[in-house]
Amino acid sequence: MTHVTLPILEDWEGLSLTTILQEKFHLGKKARHEIRMSQNVLLNNKPLDDWNTPLFVGASLSLPVFLHDKIPVYEYDLEIIYEDDFLLVVNKPVDMKTHPNDSYETDTCANAVQYYLEKTGQDANALAVHRLDQTTSGLVLFAKNKLAIAGLSWQMENRAIHRTYLAAVDGTWGLVMQTINKPIGEDRHHGSRRQISPYGQPAVTHVKVLENDKRKKHLSCRMPNRNWSDAPNSRSFKRNWPSNYWRYALWWFPSC
């Protein structure tokens, strides 16, 4: 069984293991029960039986790492931007899906990440924390196990991780900075599309012109209020926002 070893941090001082797993890693009840039943939690290399014991700075906590079923590998060498024991950040190329939606889809970014993990001898999962459109290139966060995906998903949901698009557009964009605050709802003519609608959900996009020349405009678009994919924002504003522009390149990167 694979373990991950963590030092007790200052803001964990005096907290129990139950509290750390629930409030710091945001593990659900089922995942916490799975760890408890394994009887493989170590504190300073000794079994920790009482999960209500206060933990203190300087101690070393070792937790068993549980994995989901692994997906098929796709022999594609992605650009790895960052990696540690819990996560990795990859540069997803254009025209590649983030993750498979059906069992027959095995050529996605997640499958390529699984290939990298197995090629490098890591007993880990390729768990996408978020997704990008197939036609959008940029950085994608992947968690390596259940412990990591729980914490990163919570951060994404609670906006501790932000998304920013860089877009190259053609046409006129007047203001250097502006905020588009238009609700987005379903397009009743196309089930998979979204459009600006008075009955839609709130959607905010902060736009800043980075470069402005005669041929094209480079924009920074930050969308702070969505927790899985910002693609509906960008597509809806492209179709509905009253400005004569056309997006021909898009790059995404996260910031904390």
Give names to the regions the model predicted:
Residues 191-199, 210-212:
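C-terminal amphipathic alpha-helical segment
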Residues 1-179, 183-188, 214:
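RNA pseudouridine synthases
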Residues 80, 169, 206-209, 244:
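Conserved hydrophobic positions within beta-strands
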Residues 165, 180, 203-205, 219:
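Structural detector for hydrophobic anchor residues on beta-strands
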Residues 81-82, 208-213, 224:
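Well-ordered beta-strand positions
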Residues 32, 105-113, 186, 215-256:
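Pseudouridine synthase
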Residues 72-76, 196-205:
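Short coil-to-beta-strand transition motifs
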Residues 64, 170, 174, 210, ...:
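Solvent-exposed residues in well-ordered beta-strands and their adjoining turns
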